[in-house]
């Protein structure tokens, strides 16, 4: 840490982390580091002849940290589990095998991040603002690759994910007389999430309706876009041919995304993103002498939710009111 006249600030850190998680692959230890700098502009002479801005600091940082979070204690060691059986003579012998394949180079996941922003206090420190732009890229992700054609899954360092966006916090604190005080605060954070690379461009990790694919947000929802409802037989006849299955009036009409005049598996696409556009929060505090009251509120906006529990014809719970607007004849929906 270096501080020159409370005006120019520099800091740097270095750490060498070790984890027995990667002992078997010889990657127990790895190096991680970070750098940061700040400039307190209100310490400069050209900021002295004003009384609006009490404090203004420009700041920036860059660094890399490691992660060993793989979802299990010792991921480099496979567990022997039952794996089919075979007949030898008159005997049936139970088979055993590893529950996963381990990459011989399995090691630390690396998180590279940088950010720039500033801290500003105004009006005798009553108003405080702190906007920041951040960019974080996770490389060598510890990824469980699902097995293909009956093979066991594998654990590898593969893939790259980027998260970037803005963070803003603001607050106002003041007093009313000698006994009363109050404060208002708000924060906002945006996120742009994208998978930059995976095993290859055409590779997908599938979990129910969610997918992880190169070029898309992580865990996006994958399926058919719905354009409406087939109203009658003529509507079916003059619409793209549905090769997914037979349809009748009242069935959902899917979009012909690839434009080939047919509804096929290739028309499935991204239909939703579970990552919110932004998160937000508010807080209000009120004080009188030695008593304090604080209210915190928070929420998210812009994320889609995949819900299919209303699709069953044998409902275990009450149906949602949307069922009242179901299709029940030509032109009703």
Question: Where does each model-flagged region fall?
Answer:
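Conserved small-residue
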Residues: 156, 162, 166, 173-274, ...
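Membrane-proximal, glycine/serine-rich, low-complexity loop/turn segments characteristic
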Residues: 69-86, 202-205, 213, 217, ...
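A short local loop/turn or secondary-structure capping micro-motif enriched for an aromatic residue
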Residues: 19-20, 138-139, 272-274, 302-304
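Outer-membrane beta-barrel transmembrane strand signature
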Residues: 1, 9, 91-121, 126-128, ...
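Predominantly transmembrane beta-strands of Gram-negative outer membrane beta-barrel pores used
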Residues: 34-36, 185, 283-285, 294-296
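Extracytoplasmic gating/loop element in the C-terminal half of outer-membrane beta-barrel translocons
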Residues: 19, 246-249, 300-333
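Proline-rich low-complexity regions
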Residues: 39-41, 274-276, 333
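Extracellular/periplasmic, surface-exposed regions of secreted and cell-surface proteins
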Residues: 1-221
